[in-house]
Every structure is written in C-alpha cells, then in structure tokens.
Amino acid sequence: MFYSIFIIDKEGSGAQRVPAVEAHRQYIKDRAHKILAAGATFADDGKTVRGGSYIVEMDKDEVERFVAEDPFTLAGIREKVIVQPWIKACFNGEFLITVTPPGPPDVNERLIEPERKSA
C-alpha cells in the first residue's frame, strides 16, 4: 500500500539537522526501492528547510519504523508527522483512476499527450 508522509520540522532546528544530513541521505538511499517520491519542503524564502514529504510503498508498521528510525527523527528535529494512505490517481502525466459512470468502465484517460519524437 502507498502512504504519504508529510513532516514539519521544529522551528530553528537547522543546527541539529546538519550533523544528521549524511546519515539521513544514506538511510533514504538504502530504502529507495520502497520510495516513489521524496524531498525536502522549504519555507517561503525557498532556502530554509522546514521538513519533507514522501510517497512510500510500505505497510503501516514499516511506515512507522521508517519515520521513527530516520536519523532526522532521532536527532529530535521533527515537530509534526502526518501519515495517510495514498492512491496513485495521477502519475507521470497520466490519470490512473478507472472512469466511473457516465463514462465507460475500465477506461484510463491521459491528462496530457506524450511528447512525440521527431523522425
């Protein structure tokens, strides 16, 4: 099952973040096969890290361990963590949910046309 994880870090936790960065990156790299997307989120200045967000394919227990054992969590910088089940409704330019009435059943619609390569 997919889960979204949205994390807000404690205000002013940048100094605590720095020593944990390399361990956090390795932690994420080691679990990349379970992560559909991940990245930092920023304050309005576009420079100050405020947390992160992830889309992961794990069961609920794995998600809880994933968050709890993250070096940033262990460094004490997390203020709030929101975990919710997530469905892949639109991905990579495609709408993936089966159309329900009034459209025909079992039809997937494209939101954008793929780029065509010139000959």
Task: Please state what every model-predicted region is.
Residues M1-A119:
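Conserved, structured core segments of small domains
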